[in-house]
Amino acid sequence: ARRYQLKDGMGDRLTLLNNWENTAFDFDEEKLRHLMDEAKQLGVDMFLLDDGWFGNAHPRNNDDAGLGDWQPNRTKLPNGISSLTRMATKAGVKFGLWVEPEMVNPESELYKKHPDWAITLPGRDTYYYRNQLVLDLSNPKVQDFVFSVVDDIMTENPDIAYLKWDCNSPITNIHSAYLKQKQCNLYIDHVRGVYNVMRRVSEKYPSLPMMLCAGGG
């Protein structure tokens, strides 16, 4: 894997400080600045901002809301992500960011606009992991959206050095509004859709390291 799969797999790995265990969802620019300074003092290479930085109509102050609305929260981060990348540069560390673009909370602008983009089973009680649903990546429009999440972040903040791409829910409520009569194709077409998005991201940002994790690990 190091030789053939990882980017520069035989090279050194960056060490990082993640804010999650310190702040969880409760942070602002000043708290993050202190953590960046402490990361430098510890000799860490990079500071990574985890979950909770996005959502305005449905702020990401807990795991009940906000997934799908990938705009910086104006209360926590009034100056946006770009101010954090500058802050990290001043502190002498690189900056990384958490995303989970395959997922959506029902309490989000995205879900209210496109409920058919989520994998849900009509006529049955909806089953949630971490209060969220999986977006239907068998749908090309959803693939375009998920790619655009990463593309918009990187276009607006080209100094981001690392993405932590999380996945906190398996596929539940198995049904695709897009596939209609081809429900047996959902698992395969969904995975192919994920691979397509990853390929597009990798082709446009070939030097961007990404950690693909599940449940934070």
Predicted regions and their residues:
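Hydrophobic faces of well-ordered beta-strands that scaffold small-molecule active sites
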Residues: 13-19, 45, 49, 95-99, ...
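Aromatic- and glycine-enriched glycan-recognition loops and surfaces
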Residues: 23-112, 141-145, 189-196
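Active-site neighborhood of glycoside hydrolase catalytic domains
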Residues: 73-90, 111-217
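Active-site-proximal, well-structured secondary-structure segments within enzyme catalytic domains
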Residues: 8-14, 50-51, 55, 100, ...
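Short glycine/proline-rich turn/loop motifs
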Residues: 14-20, 127-132
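Carbohydrate-recognition beta-sandwich/jelly-roll modules
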Residues: 1-12, 36, 40
